[in-house]
Amino acid sequence: MALISMRQMLDHAAEFGYGVPAFNVNNLEQMRAIMEAADKTDSPVIVQASAGARKYAGAPFLRHLILAAIEEFPHIPVCMHQDHGTSPDVCQRSIQLGFSSVMMDGSLREDGKTPADYDYNVRVTQQTVAFAHACGVSVEGELGCLGSLETGMAGEEDGVGAEGVLDHSQLLTDPEEAADFVAKTKVDALAIAIGTSHGAYKFTNPPTGDTLSIQRIKEIHARIPDTHLVMHGSSSVPQEWLKIINEYGGEIGETYGVPVEEIVEGIKYGVRKVNIDTDLRLASTGAIREFLAKNPSEFDPRKYFAKTVAAMRDICIARYEAFGTAGNASKIKPISLEGMFQRYASGELDPKIN
C-alpha cells in the first residue's frame, strides 16, 4: 500500500517542478473520481478531510474510504491529509487514526473563527510539529487569513474561517513573518494568504494582480525556498458548470475563481499543494441536476452518481495535467513513516531560510 507523507510527495514535486492538487473528499464518488483520474494520468494523490467532511462522514469512515482507494490502486502514492485542524488535539487524533499528514491552522483560535495572534499560532504549531514529526507525519501550517482582497471579507469553509471584514495586512502573508514562522515551527508546508478565499464566491470579476497577489508568492518563496507553499481556496469555478447548474434550476450568481494559469505561475515559485473543493462540488451538482431534468422518471441514485464521477474525474484529470502532476506517480519510491521519522530526527529535513 502506497500511503506516504505529504513531505515526501511535495519534496518530489519541488525537485521536478510540479504542483499537486489536494482534493477534499466527502464520499465514495469523489474518492473514485480522484483515483480514476490519477490512475489515468499516473499522478500522485493528496486527498484531504476537511472539518466539514469529518463532521459529515466522520473521520473513521473517511479513513477507511481512503484506505480502500489505496488498496484498489496500490501503484498510486497517496497522502491522507487532515485539513484545517483547529487544535493540536484534533491533529493528534487524526495521527492516531492513521493520517500521514495534518494541518494545524493556528491562524485562528480553537473556535475556527477568531483570528489568532502570531505567538499563539507559533505555539500551537510547534506543539503539533513536535508530536507529528516524531511519528513521521507531515505538518502544514497557516499564516494569514483567507479572504478577498477585493472586498476585505473573510472566507469560510465548513464552519472554519475568520468572520467579517479583515484588514489588508491579515489578507496577505508577510514574507519576513513567514520566514520567522518557519524557522520557529519547522513546518513542512505553509498555507499563505494571497487573496484567495473558500467557496464559490471568490471574485466578482476575473481576478487581477490587485485581487490575487502572485507577486507575494514570489516574495515568500525567495525567503523560504525549501518550504512548500500551499494555496487554499484555489478552485477555478468552471463557468460551464455554473451555466449547467443554472440552466437546470440552480440560482448561483455571477462569480469567478482562481484561473488555472495563475496557479501554474504560482507553481513556478514554490506552490506545491493546491487545495480544490468547490470545482468538484459544482461538477457533481451540475451533473445531478442535468441528469434528473432529462430523466424525470429515474430514481436509482447509482445512475446519477455515476454521472458525478465522470464529471469530477474530468476536472481532476485537467488539474493533474495543468499542474504537471501527471506522469510522476510511478517515479516516487515510497518511504515509510518510520523512515520519515529518521530523516526528521537527523535534522536532514530542517528548513532553509534565506
From Swiss-Prot:
GO terms for molecular function: fructose-bisphosphate aldolase activity; zinc ion binding. Binds 2 Zn(2+) ions per subunit. One is catalytic and the other provides a structural contribution. Zn(2+) 2 binds at residues 105, 142. The keyword Chloroplast does not apply. It catalyses: beta-D-fructose 1,6-bisphosphate = D-glyceraldehyde 3-phosphate + dihydroxyacetone phosphate. PANTHER family: D-TAGATOSE-1,6-BISPHOSPHATE ALDOLASE, D-TAGATOSE-1,6-BISPHOSPHATE ALDOLASE SUBUNIT GATY-RELATED. This is Fructose-bisphosphate aldolase. The lineage of its organism: Bacteria, Pseudomonadati, Pseudomonadota, Gammaproteobacteria, Pseudomonadales.
